From Swiss-Prot:
The active site is at residue 70. It is found in: Cytoplasm. InterPro entries: UDG_fam1 (IPR002043), Ura-DNA_Glyclase_AS (IPR018085), Uracil-DNA_glycosylase-like (IPR005122), Uracil-DNA_glycosylase-like_sf (IPR036895). It catalyses: Hydrolyzes single-stranded DNA or mismatched double-stranded DNA and polynucleotides, releasing free uracil. It comes from the Bacteria. Keywords: Cytoplasm, DNA damage, DNA repair, Hydrolase. Belongs to the uracil-DNA glycosylase (UDG) superfamily. UNG family. SMART domains: UDG (SM00986), UreE_C (SM00987). This is Uracil-DNA glycosylase.
Amino acid sequence: MSRSDVFADAPPADWAQAVPLLREGAHLPLLRSVARLRRSKTVYPPEGQVFAALHCTPLHTVRVVIVGQDPYHGAGQAHGLAFSVPQGVKPPPSLRNVLKEAAAQKPEAPAAAGMQHNGVQTDLTPWAEQGVLLLNTALTVEAGRAGSHAALGWHAVTDDIIRTVSERCPAVVFMLWGNHARQKAALVDTGRHLLLESVHPSPFSAHKGFLGCGHFVTANSWLAARGLLPVLW
């Protein structure tokens, strides 16, 4: 295996220097394992997009963290940002509910606006570029097998990313949706940051507390109270 195979998915320098496990190279064995798996299986997201969340959102810009579980496992969906799909791709059910809730917080926009998939709404890169870290706890997955890389070793790395944000950033809103994400609450210093928890936006649970949770408006109000710009959801 060439060095280019391993480093095609290198994290950006700011994160690599700040996150202890990245600085120590703990991600390299994981990338090697993923590279081996790609030889015989389809793995998402595509090569070069594994650390997209970190590339889109520099550490010093982080003001919101949304924690996902693992990448979408369908063709053409995963591109390295939790809950997001590329522009023009039909939104999976969980993303539809995220967009619906975000749109419902805009008094000037009908809730149905979040259901569109022919505009920028399905690609959450604009959120990421405003400092919203869209982080899955497992950064890769095998096609058609949800959770297949959960035991690969990503969780130690992504836990360290969350911990680093909590330690280094002055004021961040952490949105933890569903039991898996809520387990990460222990990594967050709630004396400095705002923790917003809810059920998962999956259609199986969204109507049990996610839709109508008000997380997006709560986050912006909390940020504004600290002199920070609100996120344009």
